[in-house]
């Protein structure tokens, strides 16, 4: 059976969309008529992109971490309840409210019914199910423990999503504060200051230096502010485009690592992500060398990723994991000590998971400290700007009062 997307009209004339499984489009139309729906369009499961490699179908837009965690959790629950994987996929598709996810899961189910493994079926959708996910599922199928492995994958995906949300929420307030501050300063300089200071200019009196400087800045903002804003947006777009070039991206990532506080945050983020990914792969039975290659792909910083790839090569040649990672110079000593302990005790996956949690807690503390320092800095900055503007307006008034006196 294959999956078909349909567009139909109900008895009241409203359009209905959905996905049905059937042997042919003709059977789908018959099923729709039995449900008192008038079929308008029926076609095989729609995909976003079709490559030229043997007609392999892929979705150009992947699943969000939240959707992936939810689908994985549902599959884990159903598989552990002794439901066959094809039935679990059908139930998860029926449970989803997203037509796109329904289509994807039913397409995976169709591949499973053709005799492919679950991991092999997921390989048809690489943007939705990353290599880490597929390798872990393959290891679970090979070991005969697919249910527990899916449960671990759901936990891993949810933890990654929660960590990402914590960082985003921690950075949200400073960003809003900075944007609001810049907007207020721009409004004062572009509209308020010119009207107030114009009175003193018309009086013909000699203005203090601070007032003249403020008038100059205000005139520049009024004349060129919009153009400067457009140029800034263009610069951001150009920078993002330049980051697509490998050479520029590596130089930028190297620069970030050299910035004192930023470099530490980047290392903490990437090493924690690497450790948690390596933990779930090794726990699921993926060979260490293969797990290292997969875990390296989740590292965002190219410099650190390249060093980990070199470390994986050393492990392949017989070196210990601890020595290989230590040679990169990118991993904190505590993490290396815990990995060494895991290698000696044979509990590498547990030590990796523990050190990843410790690193994530340390990262959260670092971000909290930065946010705590940033807030008073922005308040002091705003207070200083307002003070300068007030002084620039008051100084001519005081000078005028002295002349009158």
Swiss-Prot record:
Pfam families per the UniProt record, alphabetical: T2SSF
GO molecular function: metal ion binding
Periplasmic side: 190-219, 398-405
Binding site residues for Ca(2+): 97, 151, 155
GO CC entries: plasma membrane; type II protein secretion system complex
Cytoplasmic topological segments: 1-168, 240-376
InterPro entries with a match to the protein in the record: GspF/PilC, T2SS_GspF, T2SS_GspF/T4SS_PilC_CS, T2SS_GspF_dom, T2SS_GspF_sf
UniProt topology in membrane: Multi-pass membrane protein
Location(s), subcellular: Cell inner membrane
TM region positions: 169-189, 220-239, 377-397
Keywords assigned: Calcium, Cell inner membrane, Cell membrane, Membrane, Metal-binding, Protein transport, Transmembrane, Transmembrane helix, Transport
GO biological process: protein secretion by the type II secretion system
Gene3D superfamilies per UniProt: Type II secretion system (T2SS), domain F (1.20.81.30)
Subunit-level organization: Type II secretion system is composed of four main components: the outer membrane complex, the inner membrane complex, the cytoplasmic secretion ATPase and the periplasm-spanning pseudopilus. Homodimer. Interacts with XcpR/GspE and XcpY/GspL components.
Function field: Component of the type II secretion system inner membrane complex required for the energy-dependent secretion of extracellular factors such as proteases and toxins from the periplasm.
Protein name from the UniProt record: Type II secretion system protein F
Provenance organism: Pseudomonas aeruginosa (strain ATCC 15692 / DSM 22644 / CIP 104116 / JCM 14847 / LMG 12228 / 1C / PRS 101 / PAO1)
């Amino acid at each position: 059976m294959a999956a078909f997307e349909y567009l139909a009209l109900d008895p009241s004339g409203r359009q209905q969309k959905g996905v049905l499984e059937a042997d042919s489009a003709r059977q789908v139309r018959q099923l729709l008529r039995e449900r008192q729906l008038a079929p308008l369009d029926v076609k095989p499961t729609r995909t976003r992109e079709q490559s030229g490699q043997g007609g392999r179908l892929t979705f150009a837009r992947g699943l969000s971490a939240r959707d992936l965690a939810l689908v994985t959790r549902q599959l884990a629950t159903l598989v552990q309840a002794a439901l066959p994987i094809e039935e679990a996929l059908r139930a998860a598709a029926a449970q989803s409210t997203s037509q796109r996810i329904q289509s994807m899961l039913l397409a995976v189910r169709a591949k499973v019914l053709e005799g492919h493994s679950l991991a092999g079926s997921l390989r048809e959708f690489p943007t939705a199910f990353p290599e880490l996910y597929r390798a872990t599922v393959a290891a679970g199928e090979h070991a005969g423990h697919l249910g527990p492995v899916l449960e671990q994958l759901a936990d891993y995906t949810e933890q990654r999503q929660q960590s990402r949300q914590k960082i985003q929420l921690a950075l949200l307030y400073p960003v809003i504060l900075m944007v609001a501050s810049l907007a207020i300063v721009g409004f004062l300089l572009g509209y308020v200051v010119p009207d107030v200071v114009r009175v003193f200019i018309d009086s013909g009196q000699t203005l203090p230096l601070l007032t003249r400087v403020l008038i100059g800045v205000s005139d520049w903002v009024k004349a060129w502010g919009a153009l400067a804003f457009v140029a800034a947006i263009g610069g951001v777009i150009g920078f993002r485009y330049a980051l697509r070039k490998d050479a520029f991206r590596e130089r930028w990532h190297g620069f970030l690592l050299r910035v004192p506080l930023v470099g530490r945050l980047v290392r903490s983020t990437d090493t924690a992500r690497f450790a948690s990914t390596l933990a779930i792969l090794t726990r699921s039975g993926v060979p260490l060398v293969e797990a290292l290659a997969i875990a390296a792909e989740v590292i965002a910083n190219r410099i650190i990723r390249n060093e980990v790839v070199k470390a994986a090569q050393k492990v392949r040649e017989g070196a210990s994991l601890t020595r290989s990672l230590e040679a990169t110079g990118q991993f904190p000593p505590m993490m290396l000590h815990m990995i060494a302990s895991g290698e000696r005790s044979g509990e590498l996956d547990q030590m990796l998971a523990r050190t990843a949690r410790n690193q994530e807690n340390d990262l959260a503390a670092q971000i909290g400290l930065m946010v705590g320092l940033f807030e008073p800095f922005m308040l002091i900055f705003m207070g200083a700007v307002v003070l300068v503007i007030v002084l620039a307006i008051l100084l001519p008034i005081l000078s005028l009062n002295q002349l009158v006196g």
